[in-house]
A protein has these predicted regions:
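Feature of Fe-S/electron-transfer and energy-metabolism proteins
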Residues: 1-405
């Protein structure tokens, strides 16, 4: 795998190997395309085919379907999916309806995917309009903060003018001062492992390498979770700001968001935000007249749940089979293309932004030293108040479930 990483890294993130494999598989039935990719990267055809065959969305059986019913736990438990599947089969044919795992519409159920878009709730009643290609009005998830200070749902970074002012401040701030803020805040990774975010950035910053990377793990695959969807679609500037500042701190000039293919609106929102930042000179070469340059790319996942694990995600971007690597070495010393890499999930990056804007002391004052700050929680349609909410760490589950949910 090290050879594949190095060969893939020679071309890098722009039109990366995984993207090329995906495009060939989704847009062409001609097997000669695999040979062309293999030749370009000096790899064997079997290596490229092995990577391609790993992903559900790239398999011929999947590509032959027209619609996909969500089989995430919230939708399955709701009892809505069998009648939904029956109706889709009546419209499209028995062999044209497949399944996808959690489309992030747990708050309304009856979720399905058709022609690159997700639908849920009462959308199935407009299936004829959807098939014709008409745009329909869709339900939006409800969101609210119950925190004394909101770090994830406030509007302090909701437009490009705010973004420019805050970015100008922090890319002219001492890097160690930013790391100290994160360490003082007691922010731990929101992806599950709970590793101190400031420590991860510090380790990567101290690693010796001419090239480093920032990765946003947006492959939110846990059924019932749609908090990343909220941040990517409603707070994209918070997430991107976190990536840019991380790049500044560790000495990286390039980052990538790995967003699951089941979230088309998230991909659209992030693409739009990146393009807007580039147009304003807030991404790219010599940002705001400084010596700091940073660019962002998007990788679209192709239906592999394991890619939520950081080493499998790195393998995927490199064009390898998305299998978990043994650690150590950890990504901060040997990550993407064997270069030092920070991998943070969506909520961690957004929280880092909130800390820099609001202050580390306010964040650390919430919860305790092991679990400080605020956290997003999701309620599915079985709750009286389905949606995504920001709560303070240390809030009793009884209050979260009974009073908020």
């Amino acid at each position: 795998s090290k050879n594949i990483s190095n060969l893939s890294g020679r071309i890098g993130l722009k039109k990366n190997l995984f993207e090329k494999i995906s495009e060939r598989s989704l847009n062409s039935k001609d097997a000669s395309g695999i040979k062309e990719i293999a030749n370009e990267y000096h790899m064997g055809v079997s290596t490229i085919h092995g990577a391609e065959s790993f992903y559900e969305f790239l398999r011929p059986a999947h590509r032959a379907k027209k619609a996909f019913v969500c089989n995430g736990s919230a939708c399955m438990c709701s009892g809505t999916q069998e009648p939904l599947k029956k109706k889709l089969k009546e419209k499209l044919g028995d062999d044209k309806v497949g399944e996808m795992f959690c489309l992030g519409h747990c708050y309304e159920n009856k979720a399905f995917h058709y022609d690159g878009e997700n639908y849920a709730g009462n959308d199935i009643d407009k299936i004829d309009e959807i098939i014709k290609g008409d745009k329909i009005e869709q339900e939006k998830f409800f969101s609210k903060s119950f925190a004394s200070t909101s770090f994830l749902m406030d509007d302090k970074l909701s437009n490009l003018d705010q973004f420019k002012d805050i970015l100008s401040k922090f890319i002219n701030t001492d890097k160690q001062e930013i790391i100290k803020s994160l360490l003082d805040s007691n922010l731990t990774g929101r992806g599950g492992a709970g590793f101190p975010a400031g420590m991860k950035w510090d380790f990567c910053g101290k690693a010796k390498s001419e090239k480093k990377y920032v990765i946003c793990n947006a492959d939110e695959g846990d059924s019932g979770a749609f908090s990343d969807r909220y941040l990517l679609e409603d707070q994209p500037l918070k997430v991107l700001f976190g990536m840019i500042i991380c790049g500044y701190v560790i000495g990286s000039d390039e980052g990538v968001l790995y967003i699951r293919g089941e979230y088309p609106k998230s991909i659209e929102a992030i693409n739009g935000a990146i393009n807007s930042l580039k147009e304003e000179g807030l991404l790219g070469e010599n940002i705001l007249g400084t010596s700091f340059s940073f660019d962002l790319n998007i990788c679209i996942g192709q239906g592999a749940y394991i890619c939520g694990e950081e080493t499998a995600l790195i393998a995927s971007i490199e064009g390898r089979r998305a299998e978990v690597d043994v650690r150590p070495p950890f990504p901060v010393t040997e990550g993407l293309y064997k270069k030092p890499t920070v991998v943070n999930n969506v909520e961690t990056l957004a929280a880092a932004t909130g800390i820099l804007i609001n202050g580390a002391d306010k964040f650390s004052a919430i919860g305790n030293k092991k679990s400080a700050g605020t956290k997003l929680v999701c309620f599915d349609s079985f709750f009286n108040n389905p949606g995504v909410y920001e709560v303070e760490m240390g809030t009793p589950m009884k209050k979260v479930l009974n009073d908020i949910g």
